[in-house]
Protein backbone atom coordinates (compact mmCIF):
# COMPACT_ATOMS: atom_id res chain seq x y z
CA UNK A 1 0.00 0.00 0.00
CA UNK A 2 1.29 3.46 -0.93
CA UNK A 3 0.51 6.06 1.72
CA UNK A 4 0.80 9.83 1.33
CA UNK A 5 1.08 11.90 4.51
CA UNK A 6 0.32 15.60 4.12
CA UNK A 7 1.99 17.78 6.75
CA UNK A 8 4.84 15.30 6.95
CA UNK A 9 7.29 17.84 8.36
CA UNK A 10 5.12 18.64 11.39
CA UNK A 11 5.31 17.24 14.92
CA UNK A 12 2.86 14.37 14.40
CA UNK A 13 3.73 13.98 10.71
CA UNK A 14 7.43 13.26 11.29
CA UNK A 15 6.65 10.72 13.99
CA UNK A 16 3.96 9.06 11.87
CA UNK A 17 6.15 8.75 8.77
CA UNK A 18 8.93 7.25 10.91
CA UNK A 19 6.55 4.68 12.42
CA UNK A 20 4.93 3.70 9.11
CA UNK A 21 8.31 3.26 7.41
CA UNK A 22 9.57 1.25 10.36
CA UNK A 23 6.65 -1.18 9.93
CA UNK A 24 7.84 -1.92 6.37
CA UNK A 25 4.29 -2.74 5.32
CA UNK A 26 3.83 0.44 3.33
CA UNK A 27 5.53 2.69 0.82
CA UNK A 28 5.29 6.08 2.54
CA UNK A 29 5.52 9.55 1.00
CA UNK A 30 5.56 12.84 2.90
CA UNK A 31 3.96 15.67 0.95
CA UNK A 32 6.33 18.16 2.54
CA UNK A 33 9.35 15.86 2.29
CA UNK A 34 9.34 14.52 -1.29
CA UNK A 35 7.62 17.61 -2.68
CA UNK A 36 5.95 20.61 -1.10
CA UNK A 37 2.18 20.59 -1.45
CA UNK A 38 0.40 23.95 -1.36
CA UNK A 39 -3.13 23.05 -0.31
CA UNK A 40 -4.42 26.43 -1.46
CA UNK A 41 -3.20 25.73 -5.01
CA UNK A 42 -5.19 22.97 -6.78
CA UNK A 43 -2.41 22.53 -9.38
CA UNK A 44 0.15 21.91 -6.62
CA UNK A 45 -2.14 19.37 -4.97
CA UNK A 46 -2.76 17.55 -8.24
CA UNK A 47 0.96 17.52 -9.06
CA UNK A 48 1.83 15.70 -5.82
CA UNK A 49 -1.04 13.23 -6.22
CA UNK A 50 -0.12 12.47 -9.83
CA UNK A 51 3.52 11.80 -8.89
CA UNK A 52 2.84 9.66 -5.80
CA UNK A 53 -0.42 7.93 -6.85
CA UNK A 54 -1.24 6.96 -3.25
CA UNK A 55 -3.63 4.18 -2.25
CA UNK A 56 -4.32 5.88 1.08
CA UNK A 57 -3.86 9.44 2.35
CA UNK A 58 -3.36 10.72 5.90
CA UNK A 59 -4.26 14.41 5.81
CA UNK A 60 -2.38 16.11 8.63
CA UNK A 61 -1.42 19.40 6.98
CA UNK A 62 -3.09 22.36 8.65
CA UNK A 63 -2.52 25.87 9.87
CA UNK A 64 -2.69 26.05 13.66
CA UNK A 65 -1.32 29.55 14.20
CA UNK A 66 -1.54 32.77 12.20
CA UNK A 67 1.25 35.24 13.06
CA UNK A 68 -0.43 38.21 11.39
CA UNK A 69 -3.72 37.53 13.16
CA UNK A 70 -5.60 37.13 9.86
CA UNK A 71 -8.28 34.47 10.53
CA UNK A 72 -9.11 34.11 6.83
CA UNK A 73 -5.87 32.16 6.40
CA UNK A 74 -7.19 29.40 8.67
CA UNK A 75 -10.11 28.81 6.32
CA UNK A 76 -8.01 29.05 3.15
CA UNK A 77 -5.67 26.29 4.34
CA UNK A 78 -7.74 24.11 6.65
CA UNK A 79 -11.12 24.24 4.91
CA UNK A 80 -10.59 25.22 1.25
CA UNK A 81 -7.29 23.31 1.26
CA UNK A 82 -9.11 20.12 2.26
CA UNK A 83 -11.70 20.76 -0.45
CA UNK A 84 -8.87 21.05 -3.00
CA UNK A 85 -7.32 17.80 -1.76
CA UNK A 86 -10.53 15.75 -1.73
CA UNK A 87 -11.70 17.08 -5.09
CA UNK A 88 -8.33 16.20 -6.63
CA UNK A 89 -8.47 12.72 -5.09
CA UNK A 90 -11.79 12.08 -6.81
CA UNK A 91 -10.78 13.71 -10.12
CA UNK A 92 -7.53 11.72 -10.33
CA UNK A 93 -9.10 8.54 -8.91
CA UNK A 94 -6.41 7.98 -6.26
CA UNK A 95 -6.58 6.98 -2.57
CA UNK A 96 -9.03 4.21 -3.43
CA UNK A 97 -8.42 2.55 -0.06
CA UNK A 98 -9.41 5.67 1.85
CA UNK A 99 -8.48 8.95 3.51
CA UNK A 100 -7.89 9.80 7.17
CA UNK A 101 -8.34 13.49 8.01
CA UNK A 102 -7.11 15.16 11.19
CA UNK A 103 -9.59 17.51 12.83
CA UNK A 104 -9.22 18.75 16.41
CA UNK A 105 -10.79 18.15 19.81
CA UNK A 106 -11.11 21.92 19.98
CA UNK A 107 -14.29 21.76 17.90
CA UNK A 108 -16.19 20.54 20.99
CA UNK A 109 -15.77 23.88 22.72
CA UNK A 110 -17.41 24.23 26.13
CA UNK A 111 -19.85 21.39 26.85
CA UNK A 112 -21.91 20.48 29.91
CA UNK A 113 -20.70 16.87 30.04
CA UNK A 114 -17.33 15.84 31.50
CA UNK A 115 -16.29 13.34 28.81
CA UNK A 116 -16.51 14.64 25.25
CA UNK A 117 -17.96 12.04 22.89
CA UNK A 118 -18.19 12.14 19.11
CA UNK A 119 -21.99 12.42 19.28
CA UNK A 120 -21.89 15.90 20.86
CA UNK A 121 -22.80 18.93 18.76
CA UNK A 122 -19.58 20.89 18.10
CA UNK A 123 -19.32 24.37 19.63
CA UNK A 124 -15.95 25.71 18.41
CA UNK A 125 -14.82 28.93 20.08
CA UNK A 126 -11.92 30.09 17.89
CA UNK A 127 -11.13 30.36 14.19
CA UNK A 128 -8.78 27.37 14.14
CA UNK A 129 -11.46 25.08 15.58
CA UNK A 130 -14.14 26.67 13.40
CA UNK A 131 -12.06 26.06 10.28
CA UNK A 132 -11.70 22.40 11.29
CA UNK A 133 -15.44 22.13 11.92
CA UNK A 134 -16.00 23.47 8.41
CA UNK A 135 -13.46 20.93 7.17
CA UNK A 136 -15.54 18.12 8.66
CA UNK A 137 -18.55 19.33 6.66
CA UNK A 138 -16.39 19.27 3.51
CA UNK A 139 -15.43 15.68 4.36
CA UNK A 140 -19.10 14.69 4.64
CA UNK A 141 -19.66 15.93 1.09
CA UNK A 142 -17.03 13.52 -0.25
CA UNK A 143 -17.87 10.43 1.80
CA UNK A 144 -20.05 9.12 -1.04
CA UNK A 145 -16.89 8.93 -3.20
CA UNK A 146 -14.33 7.63 -0.70
CA UNK A 147 -14.15 6.03 2.71
CA UNK A 148 -13.02 8.99 4.83
CA UNK A 149 -12.43 8.82 8.57
CA UNK A 150 -12.01 11.92 10.71
CA UNK A 151 -9.96 11.80 13.90
CA UNK A 152 -10.20 14.39 16.65
CA UNK A 153 -6.91 14.34 18.59
CA UNK A 154 -6.77 15.86 22.04
CA UNK A 155 -3.47 17.25 23.41
CA UNK A 156 -0.63 15.30 21.80
CA UNK A 157 2.69 15.33 23.69
CA UNK A 158 6.15 13.96 23.06
CA UNK A 159 9.62 14.33 21.61
CA UNK A 160 10.03 16.84 18.80
CA UNK A 161 7.25 19.18 19.89
CA UNK A 162 7.91 22.89 19.45
CA UNK A 163 9.46 24.43 22.56
CA UNK A 164 6.93 27.28 22.40
CA UNK A 165 4.10 24.94 23.39
CA UNK A 166 3.17 24.93 27.07
CA UNK A 167 4.43 21.54 28.25
CA UNK A 168 7.75 21.55 26.31
CA UNK A 169 8.29 25.06 27.67
CA UNK A 170 7.71 23.80 31.22
CA UNK A 171 10.00 20.80 30.69
CA UNK A 172 12.77 23.06 29.41
CA UNK A 173 12.43 25.38 32.42
CA UNK A 174 12.82 22.44 34.82
CA UNK A 175 15.83 21.08 32.94
CA UNK A 176 17.50 24.50 33.18
CA UNK A 177 16.62 24.64 36.90
CA UNK A 178 14.93 28.02 36.52
CA UNK A 179 13.84 29.63 39.76
CA UNK A 180 10.53 30.91 38.39
CA UNK A 181 8.20 30.20 35.49
CA UNK A 182 5.40 32.36 34.07
CA UNK A 183 2.17 30.49 33.39
CA UNK A 184 -1.42 31.38 32.60
CA UNK A 185 -4.44 29.46 33.88
CA UNK A 186 -3.23 26.69 36.20
CA UNK A 187 -6.67 25.09 36.43
CA UNK A 188 -7.11 24.30 32.71
CA UNK A 189 -7.60 20.54 32.34
CA UNK A 190 -6.53 18.65 29.23
CA UNK A 191 -6.45 15.05 28.00
CA UNK A 192 -2.80 14.43 27.12
CA UNK A 193 -1.82 11.58 24.80
CA UNK A 194 1.64 10.44 23.73
CA UNK A 195 2.61 11.22 20.13
CA UNK A 196 3.81 7.61 19.92
CA UNK A 197 0.38 6.35 20.98
CA UNK A 198 -1.28 8.77 18.56
CA UNK A 199 0.81 7.46 15.64
CA UNK A 200 0.27 3.84 16.69
CA UNK A 201 -3.49 4.47 16.71
CA UNK A 202 -3.32 5.96 13.20
CA UNK A 203 -1.35 2.91 12.04
CA UNK A 204 -4.03 0.61 13.46
CA UNK A 205 -6.85 2.61 11.87
CA UNK A 206 -5.08 2.43 8.50
CA UNK A 207 -4.47 -1.31 8.88
CA UNK A 208 -8.14 -1.92 9.69
CA UNK A 209 -9.24 0.37 6.81
CA UNK A 210 -11.83 2.02 9.06
CA UNK A 211 -14.22 4.00 6.84
CA UNK A 212 -16.54 6.97 7.30
CA UNK A 213 -16.15 7.26 11.05
CA UNK A 214 -15.36 10.15 13.39
CA UNK A 215 -13.12 9.04 16.26
CA UNK A 216 -11.54 10.77 19.25
CA UNK A 217 -7.85 10.18 19.89
CA UNK A 218 -7.77 10.50 23.65
CA UNK A 219 -7.24 8.64 26.92
CA UNK A 220 -10.25 9.72 28.96
CA UNK A 221 -8.01 11.08 31.73
CA UNK A 222 -7.51 14.78 32.42
CA UNK A 223 -4.61 16.66 34.00
CA UNK A 224 -4.55 20.31 35.01
CA UNK A 225 -1.62 22.57 34.19
CA UNK A 226 -0.79 22.61 37.90
CA UNK A 227 -0.76 18.80 38.05
CA UNK A 228 1.70 18.74 35.13
CA UNK A 229 3.82 21.27 37.05
CA UNK A 230 3.77 19.04 40.15
CA UNK A 231 4.79 15.96 38.16
CA UNK A 232 7.73 17.85 36.69
CA UNK A 233 8.77 18.94 40.19
CA UNK A 234 8.87 15.26 41.19
CA UNK A 235 10.66 14.09 38.03
CA UNK A 236 13.31 16.82 38.16
CA UNK A 237 13.54 16.92 41.97
CA UNK A 238 13.49 20.69 41.56
CA UNK A 239 11.09 23.22 43.05
CA UNK A 240 10.11 26.31 41.13
CA UNK A 241 8.00 29.38 41.85
CA UNK A 242 5.01 30.01 39.59
CA UNK A 243 4.23 33.55 38.51
CA UNK A 244 0.83 33.82 36.91
CA UNK A 245 0.81 36.11 33.89
CA UNK A 246 -2.58 37.33 32.69
CA UNK A 247 -1.12 37.80 29.20
CA UNK A 248 -0.85 34.00 28.96
CA UNK A 249 -4.55 33.49 29.70
CA UNK A 250 -6.44 33.11 26.43
CA UNK A 251 -9.82 34.84 26.29
CA UNK A 252 -11.28 31.78 24.53
CA UNK A 253 -9.70 29.20 26.84
CA UNK A 254 -11.81 26.09 27.43
CA UNK A 255 -11.67 25.15 31.15
CA UNK A 256 -11.76 21.39 30.65
CA UNK A 257 -11.27 19.07 27.67
CA UNK A 258 -11.32 15.34 28.36
CA UNK A 259 -12.22 12.94 25.58
CA UNK A 260 -14.45 9.89 25.71
CA UNK A 261 -12.29 7.02 24.36
CA UNK A 262 -15.15 4.48 24.16
CA UNK A 263 -15.45 4.51 20.37
CA UNK A 264 -11.68 4.40 19.94
CA UNK A 265 -11.38 1.42 22.30
CA UNK A 266 -14.14 -0.39 20.41
CA UNK A 267 -11.77 -0.29 17.44
CA UNK A 268 -8.48 -0.90 19.27
CA UNK A 269 -9.76 -3.31 21.90
CA UNK A 270 -10.48 -2.53 25.54
CA UNK A 271 -7.09 -3.95 26.54
CA UNK A 272 -5.24 -1.12 24.75
CA UNK A 273 -2.87 0.63 27.16
CA UNK A 274 -2.00 4.29 26.80
CA UNK A 275 1.37 5.68 27.86
CA UNK A 276 1.01 7.45 31.21
CA UNK A 277 1.46 11.21 31.37
CA UNK A 278 4.27 10.72 33.87
CA UNK A 279 6.13 8.43 31.44
CA UNK A 280 5.69 10.97 28.62
CA UNK A 281 7.07 13.77 30.82
CA UNK A 282 10.00 11.63 31.98
CA UNK A 283 10.98 10.91 28.37
CA UNK A 284 10.66 14.58 27.42
CA UNK A 285 12.70 15.63 30.46
CA UNK A 286 15.52 13.15 29.77
CA UNK A 287 15.65 14.09 26.09
CA UNK A 288 15.76 17.83 26.84
CA UNK A 289 18.48 17.20 29.41
CA UNK A 290 20.59 15.53 26.70
CA UNK A 291 19.90 18.32 24.20
CA UNK A 292 21.04 21.04 26.60
CA UNK A 293 24.13 19.11 27.70
CA UNK A 294 25.52 18.77 24.16
From Swiss-Prot:
Descriptive protein name: GDP-6-deoxy-D-talose 4-dehydrogenase
Q: What InterPro entries would the database entry show?
A: Epimerase_deHydtase, NAD(P)-bd_dom_sf
Identify the domain of life.
Bacteria
Q: What Pfam families does the entry give?
A: Epimerase
TM regions (residue ranges) = none
What's this chain's function?
Catalyzes the conversion of GDP-4-dehydro-6-deoxy-D-mannose to GDP-6-deoxy-D-talose.
Q: In which pathway does it act?
A: Bacterial outer membrane biogenesis; LPS O-antigen biosynthesis
Positions that bind substrate: 104, 128, 155, 190
Catalytically driven reaction(s): GDP-6-deoxy-alpha-D-talose + NAD(+) = GDP-4-dehydro-alpha-D-rhamnose + NADH + H(+); GDP-6-deoxy-alpha-D-talose + NADP(+) = GDP-4-dehydro-alpha-D-rhamnose + NADPH + H(+)
Task: Tell me the protein family, please.
Answer: Belongs to the NAD(P)-dependent epimerase/dehydratase family.
Listed binding positions for NAD(+) are 11-12, 38-39, 60-64, 104, 128, 132, 154
Amino acid sequence: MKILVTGGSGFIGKNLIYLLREKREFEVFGATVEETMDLTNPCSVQSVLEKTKPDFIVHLAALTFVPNNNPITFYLVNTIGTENLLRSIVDLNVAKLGVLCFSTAGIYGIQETKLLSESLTPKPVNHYSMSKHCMEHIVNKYRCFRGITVVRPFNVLGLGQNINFLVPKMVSAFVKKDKTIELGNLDSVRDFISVNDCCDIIYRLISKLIENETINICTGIGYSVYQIFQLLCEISMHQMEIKQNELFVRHDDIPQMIGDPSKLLNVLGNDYRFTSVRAILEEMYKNRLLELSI
